[in-house]
Regions:
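Short N-terminal signal/transit or membrane-insertion segments
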Residues: 7, 63, 230-231
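Generic N-terminal targeting/processing segments that precede catalytic cores or assembly contacts
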Residues: 1-20
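A generic structural signal for well-ordered alpha-helical surface patches
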Residues: 8, 12, 31, 51, ...
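Short, glycine-rich nucleotide/cofactor-binding loops
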Residues: 3-6, 132-136, 213-218
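Conserved phosphate- and dinucleotide-binding cores of soluble alpha/beta proteins
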Residues: 155, 161-325
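Short hydrophobic "helix-edge" motifs at membrane interfaces and signal-peptide entry regions
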Residues: 9-14, 47-50, 285-287
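N-terminal active-site beta-alpha-beta segment that forms phosphate/nucleotide-binding
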Residues: 18-187
Length: 325
């Protein structure tokens, strides 16, 4: 566990993916503003810190949402109250996220339960990347329905995409599921399609870093290909998200800023050697180049539905407006 004591440490933690997952990035950014206020309550310093936080990762909308909410709250108060109010607002943001994720699980449970009642056998769920309690304040988004189903006694098994290049599925989602004693199997990223063809996937549930008001979904690279495979094989493809992940301003997926990360994340892998020491090794020829796009966009037409804290809706402007406007 790493303690963050300054706003600069918060920015670096987000940028270096020491914290990751859209809701958790938002919570970290909120407390980053608290740390900025604690360091120097000069409005100019706080504004510059807010800008740097927003710029630390461009794709996940929760980051900007949380910083904007914090700055709006601080603009309404006197300087002698600023630290207490900032701390209270950051806590409210995190408490809300936990409750939202719990509600996502309650609503998503209905879908899993319906599949189980028809199948009368283990429900096989495919997920991508990590959208669990390691990516949120608690419960997770995509994993929350799974945890609720497991707690209710519904037998579930999860296909866990390894999610190259950082292997968040293999390293984080599988770890979470093991801790919750939920059966899971790690698969290579390109395995999902054949599993769907074989009828071994009942439902896909993924998270999202930014969902547009028209239902387009921006998530970890590889999500789009899973949605295409699911569509071709008539497998339901759901996206789980809190309302803080909705971008009401950008109207087309092509306009979402897609983060390009260091190519070394792709060309090198980290792991434990036989002595349990962490090692990083190059897996490509020295002269080869690599491009590391962190996210892709899944058009709304491939999304069966959005699982939110207020219920389930179709991935469309009309569906989202019915719940949130």
């Amino acid at each position: 566990i790493k303690e963050l004591k300054t706003v600069k440490e918060s920015i670096n933690a987000i940028k270096l993916m020491e914290v990751r997952g859209a809701p958790l990035i938002g919570g970290t950014a909120a407390y980053g503003i608290v740390l900025a206020v604690q360091e120097n309550n000069d409005p100019e310093f706080i504004k510059k810190s807010a800008d740097k936080l927003i710029q630390s990762r461009p794709t996940a909308i929760n980051l900007k949402w949380a910083v904007d909410r914090m700055m709006k709250k601080l603009s309404e108060i006197n300087s002698d109250q600023i630290l207490d109010i900032a701390l209270k607002e950051a806590k409210e943001i995190c408490d809300e996220d936990e409750k939202f994720c719990e509600n996502i699980g309650i609503h998503g449970l209905e879908i899993i339960e319906e599949i189980y009642n028809k199948k009368k056998d283990t429900v096989n769920i495919l997920t991508h990347c990590n959208a669990g309690w390691l990516a949120t304040i608690n419960w997770g988004t995509a994993t929350s329905p799974i945890y609720h189903a497991h707690k209710k006694g519904i037998p579930v098994h999860v296909w866990v995409d390894e999610t190259r290049p950082r292997n968040q599925g293999a390293n984080l989602t599988s770890y979470e599921l093991n801790e919750e004693e939920i059966p899971n199997t790690i698969i290579a990223d390109n395995t999902g399609g054949i599993l769907m063809q074989r009828g071994e996937v009942d439902i896909c549930i993924v998270g999202t870093d930014r969902t547009l008001s028209n239902g387009d979904v921006c998530n970890k690279i590889g999500t789009y290909l899973k949605a295409l495979a699911a569509n071709d094989n008539n497998v339901p493809f759901y996206v789980a998200l809190p309302s803080s992940t909705i971008d009401w301003e950008i109207t087309e997926g092509k306009n979402i800023p897609i983060e390009i990360r260091n190519s070394e994340e792709l060309s090198h892998v980290e792991g434990l050697d036989e002595n349990n020491d962490i090692k990083k090794i190059l897996i490509y020829p020295n002269k080869s180049k690599a491009m590391n796009l962190a996210f892709d966009v899944t058009p709304a037409k491939y999304v069966t539905g959005l699982i939110t804290e207020k219920g389930i809706c179709e991935a469309s402007s009309e569906g989202l407006k019915r719940l949130f406007k």
